[in-house]
């Protein structure tokens, strides 16, 4: 049975009323348009659905706005939140004038990275396994006006609520600052919420593993299994969608901001990755930590291009409030076996099939398709140019003396990341995976955000400087 036939079987089986077409913008935000089921026939899968691309930031100008959503029938899944029976289908964005994939479509770029890897003869499969963390609050308020800039959040788990009056009483069980890793209830108040999120993800076909409380108060993580690059990008988009909507249904609010809370750990998205060829893992060998030489070159490519990668893996100004010393954030560009203070870690596994590299500096504000594709391209460049990462750093990098620390390269800041991407993008442009036009438009988009941040007076500036 064809994938398109399966879509129509799902429509019939669930008495579907709407087909929700979903696509991802350059920032990583999921968008949708709902088609009444009567408009969906086999021709739609051939011709696609037209939409206005000028309304999406970083895409078309208004005088060339027409674009096509090309449905991917393999992604069809029932939506768990819609009141009317709704079938979700993820889409790629195409150029109507050429009938080819749009060069700025993130999902298309991820597909192009997989295709380039195979055409280069290095590997035929790239696996990615992200570990995305998030915060859940009971309430959040923020305001940005000429005369007022503020934010305020509240969570019953927060250490700042220890003396707060609650209608049913303040029961006192809550994690302290940096004290939230793996406690049982009642200190962990989010277990049922996370279990619901994980169950909904499983219903949507996302392969799930576990859930647990994270280090910070009100911080959580769901574990999903690794998959191929594009498929994992799809799974991450549904991960965020489910987390936001289940939290909303519980009367709470979830955020994937890397650093919403000052003074506690931020949220990362560690990315486990490996490449295979003809069913064989390419990262297992007899070098350091039982890695292959090819795996070391892959790590070398990531470390060499890390500052350009930061523009995709840590794309927001808030990202760099997480990447500071003192909060378990991997700011040092080094690699090590099992050592979580290094930005590239090689987890211990007994099986060669499980041999992988964990890149620890990315965060969940990243567009998953672009971040995964950029990491793969950096790793492939390392392999092609035999870029060795140097000696491993097996000591605790957080405790290095100042003179040793100064010799270890670090991740960068928001502006430096964009400048680095501008100067170091040739590895991304191989095979036209990331086109020059796409990179320039992405830099422009993120520069707008950076300028908005840099030119806005901050409340702490009033505290420090008002009386100068």
Curated annotation (Swiss-Prot):
Where is this protein chiefly located?
A: cytoplasm
Q: Where does ATP bind?
A: 209, 272-274, 340, 345, 353
- List, for all copies, the residue spans of the domain called GS beta-grasp: 14-98
| Compartments, record wording | Cytoplasm
Any one of the GO CC terms = cytoplasm
- One Pfam family of this protein, by short name? Gln-synt_N
Q: Which residues bind L-glutamate?
A: 265-266, 322, 328, 340, 360
On cofactor binding, the record's note says: Binds 2 Mg(2+) ions per subunit.
Which PROSITE patterns did the record assign?
GLNA_1 (PS00180), GLNA_ADENYLATION (PS00182), GLNA_ATP (PS00181), GS_BETA_GRASP (PS51986), GS_CATALYTIC (PS51987)
* Keyword Nucleotide-binding tagged: yes
- Residues recorded as binding Mg(2+) 2, renumbered to this chain, are 133, 214, 221
Q: What is its EC number?
A: 6.3.1.2
Binding positions for Mg(2+) 1 per the UniProt entry: 131, 270, 358
Per the record, residues carrying O-AMP-tyrosine are 398
Q: Write down the NCBIfam families for this protein, in alphabetical order.
A: GlnA
Cite the PANTHER family for this sequence: GLUTAMINE SYNTHETASE
Subunit structure comment from the entry: Oligomer of 12 subunits arranged in the form of two hexameric ring.
Q: What protein name does the entry list?
A: Glutamine synthetase
> Highest lineage ranks of the organism?
Bacteria, Pseudomonadati, Pseudomonadota, Alphaproteobacteria, Rhodospirillales
Q: Which gene encodes it?
A: glnA
């Amino acid at each position: 049975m064809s994938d398109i036939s399966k879509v129509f079987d799902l429509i019939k089986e669930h008495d579907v009323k709407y087909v929700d077409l979903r696509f991802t913008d350059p920032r990583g935000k999921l968008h949708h348009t709902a088609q009444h089921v009567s408009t969906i026939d086999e021709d739609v899968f051939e011709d696609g659905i037209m939409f206005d691309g000028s309304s999406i930031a970083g895409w078309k100008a208004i005088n060339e706005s027409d674009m096509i959503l090309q449905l991917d029938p393999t992604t069809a899944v029932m939506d768990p939140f819609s009141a009317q029976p709704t079938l979700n289908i993820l889409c790629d964005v195409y150029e109507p004038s050429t009938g080819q994939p749009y060069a700025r479509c993130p999902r298309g770029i991820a597909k192009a990275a997989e295709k380039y890897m195979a055409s280069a003869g290095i590997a035929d499969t790239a696996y990615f396994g992200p570990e995305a963390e998030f915060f859940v609050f009971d309430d959040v308020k923020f305001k940005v006006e000429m005369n007022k800039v503020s934010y305020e959040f509240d969570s019953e788990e927060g250490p700042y609520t220890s003396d707060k009056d609650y209608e049913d009483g303040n029961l006192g069980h809550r994690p302290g600052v940096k004290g939230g890793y793996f406690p049982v209830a009642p200190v962990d108040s989010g277990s049922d919420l996370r279990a619901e999120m994980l169950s909904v993800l499983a219903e949507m076909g996302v392969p799930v593993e576990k859930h647990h409380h994270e280090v910070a108060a009100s911080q959580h993580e769901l574990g999903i299994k690794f998959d191929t690059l594009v498929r994992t990008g799809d799974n991450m988009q549904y991960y965020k969608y489910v987390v936001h909507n289940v939290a909303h249904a519980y009367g709470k609010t979830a955020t994937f901001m890397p650093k919403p809370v000052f003074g506690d750990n931020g949220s990362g998205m560690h990315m486990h990755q490996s490449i295979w060829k003809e069913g064989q893992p390419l990262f297992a060998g007899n070098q350091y930590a039982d890695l292959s030489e090819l795996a070391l070159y892959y790590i070398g490519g990531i470390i060499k291009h890390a500052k350009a990668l930061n523009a995709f893996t840590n794309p927001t100004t808030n990202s760099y409030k997480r990447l500071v010393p003192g909060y378990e954030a991997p700011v040092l560009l080094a690699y090590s076996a099992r050592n979580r203070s290094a930005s590239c870690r090689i987890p211990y596994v007994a099986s060669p099939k499980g041999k992988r590299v964990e890149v620890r500096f990315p965060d969940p504000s990243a567009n998953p398709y672009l971040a995964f594709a950029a990491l793969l391209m950096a790793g492939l460049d390392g392999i092609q140019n035999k870029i060795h990462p140097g000696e491993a750093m097996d000591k605790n990098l957080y405790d290095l003396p100042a003179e040793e620390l100064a010799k270890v390269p670090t991740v960068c800041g928001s502006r430096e990341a964009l400048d680095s991407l501008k100067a170091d993008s040739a590895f991304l442009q191989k095979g036209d995976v990331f086109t020059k036009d796409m990179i320039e438009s992405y830099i422009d988009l993120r520069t707008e955000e950076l300028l908005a941040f840099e030119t806005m007076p901050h409340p702490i500036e009033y505290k420090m400087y008002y009386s100068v």
